[in-house]
Amino acid sequence: AVWRWLYEHPEASAAELRSAVTRIAQEVWNKHYAPIFGKKDVIAEIEGWYSCTSDTPDFWRRDGEPYPMHGGRFTGDPAYFKHVRKAAKKLMERLDLRVSDVNYFVAHQPNVQFPMRIAKELGFKEEQYLPSLQVAKFGNTYSGSSPVGLAAVLDIAKPEERILIVSYGSGAGSDAYSLVATSQILEKRKRQKLTLKYQAENPFLEYVDYTTYRRLKNGM
C-alpha cells in the first residue's frame, strides 16, 4: 500500500509521506488485524511467554516535533537485535524448546533485513521464517507487523504446529510468545474469506482512498 501511494503521488513531500505511512498502518491494523483472545474455541493456545525491557531510546519524538526520529544504526544491534534475541532465547529455554521444535518463527518486521537476520542467527531455516515475512507486501505496519506475520502463518498452520512470535517496541522491549495451533484451526479457517494472501494480491483492495488523500492535502 505504501509503494502504491508513492507511485500515485510522485510529487509528495516528505511530510506528506510520513503522514501517509502512519495513516496506512492505522487503517491496515484497525480494519483487518484485530486479534481476539479467549479461553475456549481457540485456533491456537498460548504455551508460554517472556518479556524483556531496557532503557534504550532508539526511537523518539522531541518536544514540539510532529514526527519521531530514529537513531540510525543504533536501532539495530543495541535495540532490535538485542531484545528480540533475548526474548526468543529466554522463552525457548523456559519451555525447553529447540529450534527444530518450532514450525514457524515470526519476528517484528520493520524491514526485510532485520527479521531475516535474527531468524538465521537463532538457527531457523527459510521454511520456518519466510511464511511470516510480509513487510515487502504491506510495508512497515509498526506494532502491527508481527501480528500481520502471525496472521499469515495462521492461514497455513496445521493442528499441533508451534509458532514462536517475537514483537519489538522502541524504548525498548520485546515480548515472545509460543503458540500451538489447535484442531479447530482447520474448521474455522474455512469461514475466513479475507485471508492475508488475498489482501496482499487483490489489485482492487485499496487502503489509501480519496478521503485519505483529501485529509493529507488539508493537513490531516
State where each predicted segment sits.
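Condensing-enzyme catalytic core mediating Claisen C-C bond formation in acyl metabolism
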Residues: 23-26, 31-82, 86, 165-171, ...
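A beta-strand-loop signature enriched in Asp, Gly, Thr, and Trp
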Residues: 118-149, 159
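Phosphate/pyrophosphate-binding loops at sites that engage ATP/ADP/AMP, CoA/4′-phosphopantetheine
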Residues: 87-101
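Charged, low-complexity interaction regions
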Residues: 10-14
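Short glycine/threonine-rich loop-to-helix capping motif typified by GTGT followed
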Residues: 109-125, 177-178
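Active-site-proximal alpha-helical scaffold in enzymes
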Residues: 1, 15, 23-26, 31-37, ...
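Short glycine-rich phosphate-binding loop at a beta-alpha junction
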Residues: 100-108
